[in-house]
Curated annotation (Swiss-Prot):
It is a peripheral membrane protein. GO terms for biological process: proton motive force-driven plasma membrane ATP synthesis. GO terms for molecular function: ATP binding; proton-transporting ATP synthase activity, rotational mechanism. This is ATP synthase gamma chain. CDD domains: F1-ATPase_gamma. Keywords: ATP synthesis, Cell membrane, CF(1), Hydrogen ion transport, Ion transport, Membrane, Transport. It comes from the Bacteria. The gene is atpG. F-type ATPases have 2 components, CF(1) - the catalytic core - and CF(0) - the membrane proton channel. CF(1) has five subunits: alpha(3), beta(3), gamma(1), delta(1), epsilon(1). CF(0) has three main subunits: a, b and c. Produces ATP from ADP in the presence of a proton gradient across the membrane. The gamma chain is believed to be important in regulating ATPase activity and the flow of protons through the CF(0) complex. Disulfide bonds: none annotated. Belongs to the ATPase gamma chain family. It is found in: Cell membrane. Its main location: membrane.
Length: 288
């Protein structure tokens, strides 16, 4: 049986850990609220962008922009959105499991058939350590990323499709549903499907100058990059929700462990006192 000193040391150590996890839970809660606000504030812009793309592409059945054209797939690009820090529950593991399974299924891990652009140190370290074909990365992204801060990697992803280096581009990220629920999504960004640019648009009665093809040349890359930015904002909310849940569970588990250790400590202390009393009584009896 552990000594009283050992048990007391474990209780104190667990209490300190509990204080840390509780503080991290509170920080994640605050960051989650800001991340949700950022994601929600981006929705109106994304809706307007979708309307513009639908108005131009949907009404132009002869649109011949490369980003709308399917072609034989020789190489596939994957944009993987993870985070820089751990202690976020299954957040990173689920995303990485999703993308590695798809790479195995589609390419049998042949590096000539795919390339990965990764956001987040956890994803980068994981994929590099396992010799996946990582061709670009962003590390150290802010909790409230600006469009400018992700411009390099989003532009790289889109331009590699435009130049033919990638024949299709997928994005893997965690979609925020609620504090307790997040889902890993795989979204095909490029080529943009005809269904995605078809349908009704609030801008359908507008006139476009100089012409729709010229506007498509500008707006389609912006649209694809906006999809990436929206997924990053969504992923940030998922990250903080997952970390908040993980820290709450850790705090609750620490409390249970402290209760168990306290009970164990009291029993050991009671046994020690009983032993001392027995020895005193036995010694007194021996003197009679």
């Amino acid at each position: 049986m552990a000594s009283l000193r050992d048990i007391k040391g474990r209780i104190n150590s667990t209490k300190k850990t509990s204080q840390i996890t509780k503080a991290m839970h509170m920080v994640s809660n605050s960051k989650l609220r800001r991340a949700e606000e950022n994601a929600k504030s981006f929705y109106p812009y994304m809706e307007k962008m979708q309307d513009a793309v639908t108005a131009i592409g949907g009404s132009n059945s002869d649109a011949n922009h490369p980003m709308l054209q399917k072609r034989p797939v020789k190489k596939t690009g994957y944009l993987v959105i993870t985070c820089d820090k751990g202690l976020a529950g299954p957040y990173n593991a689920n995303i990485l499991k999703s993308v590695t399974q798809k790479i195995q299924e589609r390419h049998n891990n042949n590096p000539a058939e795919y390339g990965i652009l990764v956001i987040g140190r956890v994803g980068y370290d994981f994929l590099r350590a396992r010799d996946y074909n990582v061709e670009g990365q962003i590390i150290g992204l802010s909790d409230q990323p600006s469009f400018k801060s992700i411009k390099d990697i989003s532009h790289t992803a889109v331009s590699r499709f435009e130049t033919g280096e990638y024949d299709e581009l997928y994005m893997h990220y965690s979609h925020f549903i609620s504090v307790l629920e997040q889902e890993v999504h795989e979204r095909k960004i490029l080529p943009i499907s005809k269904e995605e640019v078809s349908g009704e648009s609030k801008l359908s009665n507008y006139e476009f100058e100089p012409d729709k093809d010229a506007i498509l040349e500008v707006i389609l890359p912006q649209y694809a990059e906006s999809l990436i930015y929206g997924a990053i904002l969504d992923g940030k909310a998922s990250e903080h929700a997952s970390r908040m849940t993980a820290m709450k569970n850790a705090t609750d588990n620490a409390k249970e462990l402290i209760d168990d250790l306290s009970l164990q400590y009291n029993r050991a202390r009671q046994a020690a006192i009983t032993q001392q009393i027995t020895e005193i009584v036995g010694g007194a009896a021996a003197l009679e």
